[in-house]
Structure formats: C-alpha cells, structure tokens
C-alpha cells in the first residue's frame, strides 16, 4: 500500500512544473511579422486583380514578402474566413477559404454616411413618439366595434352551419339518383 500512495504523489508535483515551463515560453516568441489580416490586406492591394485574388496567390505574396513559418497556410485560411465574417474582406467566388477575395472598402464609406444620417433621424424620432399616441386613440375605438362584431359573427356562423348541412344532403340525393338510373338500365 505504500507503493500506491507514493505513485499518486509523484505525478502531482510534475504537473505544476510543466505549467510553469509553458508560461515562461510564451513571452519568449515575439512575432516577426504583422498580423495575418494586415498581410492579406497588403497582398490584395499589391496584386490589384479585378476579380479578386485567390488564397494561393495571397500565400505566395505573403511568403515572398514576410518572414512566416511553415504553418502560414493554415493561418491565412483562418484569417480569410475571419476577414469575410467581420466585413473587412469580400468573398467574390467560392466558399470558405477557397475562391477569390477582395478588400471590402466600399462598405466602409456607407458606414460614414449612415453615421451622418443618424443625427437627422433624431428629429423624426420625436415626431414618431407623437404618432403612436394618435394610433393608440384610434385603436381604442376600434376595439369596441370589434366586440360588437363578435356578437354578430356567432349568429352568422349558426346560420351558415345549417346551410352547409342542407348542401351536403342535396349532393347525396343527386348521387343516389345517379345510382338509381344506372341500376334501372
């Protein structure tokens, strides 16, 4: 039993040592290149393709102009997907990280125009607050006639139901007459 007690005690001290080593190694590796999103943006600007640049062309440009590791392809794929979802890039063809990409600069200018329009929208907002009060006044009288209509509607429904019942026996009578004619022949 002494052996089993010693065995669990040994792994416990070894795990904190490993955690301490990992924490020390993280600050030692500074990036020797800009963000992948920035590198992709510079690649798209310099390639200047009308229909957009492919991931492979972007990868070639990044490897030629920046010092990146062997896993740059994976990082570029992820950065392209993030750029499309954030709106920084526009996906021209394909899906995911395949296809052609362009910088989405056109979407930035409407945002500025929308910000300018936001201040005039405040004035109509005050007018809109007055309009709902008028709408509420119109809704209240509308509810009262609606209640009267509900009283009238059940009477109409009762009248409609017997009419429907009368219509169905007539159809059956017609069918019986047709059957009778067939039997006589």
UniProtKB/Swiss-Prot annotation:
Task: Note the PANTHER family from the entry.
Answer: HISTONE 24-RELATED, HISTONE H1
Concerning PROSITE patterns, the annotation shows: H15
A single Gene Ontology biological process assigned to it is: negative regulation of DNA recombination
Supply the name of the protein. Histone H1-delta
Q: Which residues form the H15 domain?
A: 32-105
Q: Which InterPro entries match?
A: H1/H5, Histone_H1/H5_H15, WH-like_DNA-bd_sf, WH_DNA-bd_sf
Which residues fall in a compositionally biased region of kind Basic residues? 109-185
